[in-house]
A protein has these predicted regions:
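Conserved beta-strand-loop-beta-strand hairpin that lines the nucleotide-binding pocket
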Residues: 1-15, 61-152
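Alpha-helical macromolecular-interaction surfaces
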Residues: 27, 48-51, 83, 122
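Short alpha-helix lining the ATP-binding pocket of the histidine-kinase-like ATPase
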Residues: 54, 58, 62
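STAS-typified acidic loop motif
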Residues: 14-27
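Conserved short strand/loop->alpha-helix "switch" segment adjacent to the catalytic nucleotide/phosphoryl-transfer site
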Residues: 30-54, 109-110
Length: 152
């Protein structure tokens, strides 16, 4: 289910739920990215947002919900004129961010897994884990907004 609302202020919000299936990730990313492109909130950072969103959804489906067909993943995306915030919530038990292995450590560089959180943090301006790790909240500002802020 997907809903899009103009909340009366600067935020256009999309709420979307997807089943815990890997095949549902790409169509869900496409829906969110369509809104982001139409809003033009981070035109210079769309690819970064898309990569981070894919990683967040993959983590939620695979690690959070363990691809359990009875569980869903929930997305909330808020597009403002110069930024986008995205929250991804799974129905799993959560995790301790401090116990996640560093993918840049020599013993982990050969692994084919374990880079999702690293990529989210690399491509987004802010990444926070909430509610014991079942929610990841990410924010990306446009580079134009960052330039305006640096002039203040």
């Amino acid at each position: 289910m997907t809903t899009v609302q103009n909340l009366g202020g600067p935020c256009i919000e999309l709420k979307h739920s997807l089943p815990s299936e890997v095949a549902a990730i790409s169509p869900s990313v496409d829906k969110v990215m369509l809104l982001i492109r139409e809003c033009g909130c981070v035109a210079d950072g769309e690819t970064d947002v898309e990569i981070a969103l894919r990683e967040a959804l993959a983590n939620a489906v695979i690690h959070g919900n363990h691809q359990n067909p009875r569980k869903n993943v929930h997305i909330r995306c808020c597009c403002k004129p110069d930024e986008v915030t995205i929250a991804v919530k799974d129905e799993g038990r959560g995790f301790d961010i401090n116990k996640v292995a560093d993918p840049t450590a020599p013993e982990n560089t050969g692994s084919v897994h374990g880079r999702g959180i690293y990529l989210m943090k690399a491509f987004m301006d802010e990444v926070h884990f909430e509610e014991g790790g079942v929610v990841v909240r990410m924010r990306k500002s446009s580079s134009q907004a960052a330039k305006k802020d640096s002039l203040k």
